């Protein structure tokens, strides 16, 4: 009997294992949480997954970031740089076109002399050719030079004598010299006028006296101060002992050394009345 029961129990175990493996292969749901695929790898799925499958459009709840002052400055700088680059390229193309059509004359080579006619009208060139053939027919064809005006010395600049240490009798002249004390006789008033202007800008509602009147007042105050009698009494600085004689110490209740203002009422025990 025992052998029959053991065989039945083993057969039951094998059947349950086969059933469980068959369920896993078919993809059965266990406890509403585990789903197995054909391979046998389990995946855990949320119970309320259907509520999260469709994501809401959250862009409507956010505002776009505003550009800062630095970003605006950099963007404007890029625009200006690109515009200047385009203008420079356009100028280069125009210059190349002009130089190709009208090459400049060169005095080194003979071939470039013929290109000078592109810069001047035919009438002017005919006049130049006639004048050159009449006076100097053998010379090459060149345009006349512009008349140069001589640089005349301005009469406003004075001339100072120059005395050399080697030869004191030599007579030379120069337009400059070192300044001496005799050149600075007037008092400088630039700083005073500048200070008055700044004061007028800062306080436009006030009226300021002229500079010469203020100078007169200062001179008068200096004279009055000098005329005052000066006392010859020798004064000494106050000491702590002399201060304690006139102002006695006042004791007040409290815990700390400096009282810290904890006393609700200051009770003066000793006081002297100074008449």
From Swiss-Prot:
Pfam families, alphabetically? TSGA13
Region annotation (Disordered) maps to: 1-28
Where does this protein have compositionally biased stretches of type Polar residues? 1-20
| Top-level taxonomic group | Eukaryota
**Bridged cysteine pairs (disulfide):** none
Annotated InterPro entries? TSGA13 (IPR029241)
Q: In which tissues is it expressed?
A: Testis-specific.
Name the UniProt record assigns to this protein: Testis-specific gene 13 protein
Q: Which organism is it from?
A: Homo sapiens
């Amino acid at each position: 009997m025992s052998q029959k029961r053991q065989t039945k129990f083993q057969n039951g175990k094998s059947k349950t294992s086969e059933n469980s493996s068959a369920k896993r292969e078919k993809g059965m749901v266990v406890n509403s949480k585990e789903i197995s695929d054909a391979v046998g790898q389990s995946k855990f799925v949320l119970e309320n997954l259907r509520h999260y499958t469709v994501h809401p459009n959250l862009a409507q709840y956010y505002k776009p970031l505003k550009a800062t002052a630095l970003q605006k400055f950099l963007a404007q700088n890029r625009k200006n740089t690109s515009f200047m680059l385009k203008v420079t390229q356009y100028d280069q193309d125009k210059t190349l076109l002009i130089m190709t059509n009208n090459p400049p004359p060169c005095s080194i080579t003979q071939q470039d002399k013929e290109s000078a006619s592109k810069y001047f009208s035919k009438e002017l060139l005919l006049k130049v050719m006639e004048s050159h053939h009449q006076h100097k027919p053998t010379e090459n064809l060149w345009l006349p030079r512009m008349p140069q005006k001589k640089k005349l010395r301005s009469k406003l600049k004075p001339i100072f004598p120059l005395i050399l240490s080697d030869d004191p009798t030599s007579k030379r002249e120069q337009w400059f010299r070192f300044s001496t004390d005799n050149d600075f006789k007037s008092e400088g008033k630039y700083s005073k006028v500048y200070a008055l202007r700044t004061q007028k800008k800062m306080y436009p509602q006030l009226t300021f006296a002229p500079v010469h009147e203020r100078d007169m007042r200062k001179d008068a105050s200096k004279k009055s101060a000098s005329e005052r009698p000066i006392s010859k009494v020798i004064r000494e600085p106050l000491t702590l002992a002399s201060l304690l004689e006139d102002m006695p110490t006042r004791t007040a209740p409290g815990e700390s050394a400096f009282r810290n203002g904890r006393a609700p009422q200051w009770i003066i025990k000793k006081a002297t009345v100074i008449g």
